[in-house]
């Protein structure tokens, strides 16, 4: 059985999280290393599966390059999400490093990239405003425990029953949200006030700021997209994202272009990772934080598992839902100890990982190590990257996330209606509400179908 076939069989079986323990049989005084018994414990990470299948230097080169590409995107994005969430920028970096490493090392998806997510901005900001950073850390750790319990109850497998139209609509909605979040940097706009979170007010504010558009930023973003598309067309084996970022950064630095960079937007990058410590939870009420913890757990579980489903669709692989849920839970329990915020699998960075040619979870682990390395050694160089170039990359990622072929396959009005409702509720209301609306509508249509026929 080849690697893909084995992975599919393991994914559909009722697997548990498993570390593999090797027990040597010693039935005689002589030492015999040949007979081994493999004992499986629940929830095998995909990292273990990959190692069993064999891991070559060629695979490592693919993962190292993909991890570097994702890290280049994740570094400013993690800081920006943290700032928008009312947390210090280094909290986003710590989340990408610790949470990203744990999600990839322990997760049930080969390609999942963990870190801070834009979907959590409003929820995380409201928790920090009400309970402070200590309250967020406690709520995040509680959410992690809830995720692990959910995995033990096999709730992660429920994502397999989410209708395909809901997944396609949700993914398209996320793509629109991601693209909208990049318009500011794509056009080099200067906003008079902080950028609103909801789509309608965001687009209104961006339109009002349109006279401030920076032609140099627009040119850099357009050139970045053009370089990536050209390389993927004529030299598909070349690292298109990395080359585009290096060329854009070099041009902006050499020509002294008046565009925002990581350095001008975010200031200095932290140069060390804090020692893990338990923050003071004095005055924090577990009962008061429980609703927030449940919301974090539900949203994190849904986004992570749907992100894994998206990666499955892009690669033909199958993830292990409950193993992924355990990894997300462990990451959310441990990341706050390093000063991080809530962790989840992120569709944009996961899609970037796949598009960059990742082979397996080591790319996600490398992405975390690269972010740490940049934080320790390469802060001055990283500060030169134009935000317009990164916005161009994410705009292209958002475009590629929309499953256009899958949308065209939905020829019946029922699935199309489910897709449209999921998409619209996701972009105009809330991610969880979008998924819930799509599932409820799908169930309703399935319930009404036999009655219409009779």
Regions found by a protein language model. Give the residues of each.
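Juxtamembrane/membrane-water interface recognition
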Residues: 20-22, 84
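Ala/Thr-enriched low-complexity intrinsically disordered regions
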Residues: 12-13, 19-20
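Transmembrane helical cores of multi-pass ion-transport proteins
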Residues: 31-454
């Amino acid at each position: 059985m080849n690697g893909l076939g084995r992975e599919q069989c393991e994914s559909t079986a009722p697997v548990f999280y498993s570390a593999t323990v090797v027990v040597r049989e010693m039935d005689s005084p002589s030492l015999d290393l040949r007979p081994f018994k493999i004992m499986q414990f629940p929830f095998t990470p995909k990292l273990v599966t990959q190692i069993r299948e064999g891991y070559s230097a060629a695979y490592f080169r693919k993962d190292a390059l993909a991890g570097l590409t994702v890290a280049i995107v994740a570094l400013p994005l993690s800081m920006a999400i943290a700032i928008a969430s009312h947390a210090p920028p280094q909290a986003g970096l710590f989340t990408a490093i610790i949470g990203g490493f744990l999600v990839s090392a322990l997760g049930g998806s080969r390609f999942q990239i963990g870190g801070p997510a834009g979907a959590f901005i409003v929820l995380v900001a409201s928790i920090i405003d009400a309970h402070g950073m200590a309250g967020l850390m406690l709520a995040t750790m509680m959410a992690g425990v809830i995720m692990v319990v959910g995995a033990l109850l096999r709730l992660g497998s429920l994502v397999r029953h989410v209708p395909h139209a809901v997944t396609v609509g949700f993914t398209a909605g996320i793509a629109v949200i991601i693209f909208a979040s990049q318009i500011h940097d794509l056009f080099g706009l200067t906003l008079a006030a902080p950028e609103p979170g909801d789509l309608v007010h965001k687009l209104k504010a961006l339109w009002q700021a349109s006279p401030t558009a920076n032609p140099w930023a627009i040119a850099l973003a357009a050139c970045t997209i053009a370089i990536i598309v050209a390389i993927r067309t004529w030299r598909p084996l070349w690292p298109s994202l990395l080359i585009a970022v290096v060329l854009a950064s070099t041009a902006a630095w050499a020509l002294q272009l008046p565009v925002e960079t990581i350095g001008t937007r975010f200031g200095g990058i932290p140069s060390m990772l804090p020692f893990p410590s338990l923050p003071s939870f004095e005055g924090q009420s577990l009962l008061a934080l429980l609703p927030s913890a449940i919301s974090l757990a539900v949203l994190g579980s849904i986004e992570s598992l749907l992100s894994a489903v998206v990666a499955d669709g892009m690669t033909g692989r199958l993830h292990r839902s409950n193993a992924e849920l355990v990894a997300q839970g462990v990451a959310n329990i441990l990341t706050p100890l390093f000063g991080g915020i809530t962790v989840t699998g992120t569709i944009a960075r996961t899609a970037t990982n796949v598009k960059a040619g990742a082979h397996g979870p080591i790319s996600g682990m490398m992405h975390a190590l690269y972010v740490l390395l940049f934080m320790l050694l390469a802060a001055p160089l990283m500060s030169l990257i134009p935000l317009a170039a990164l916005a161009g990359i994410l705009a292209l990622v958002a475009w590629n996330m929309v499953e256009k072929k899958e949308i065209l396959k939905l020829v019946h009005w029922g699935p199309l209606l489910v897709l449209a409702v999921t998409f619209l509720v996701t972009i105009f209301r809330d991610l969880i509400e979008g998924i819930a609306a799509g599932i409820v509508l799908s169930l309703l249509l399935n319930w009404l179908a036999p009655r219409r026929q009779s």
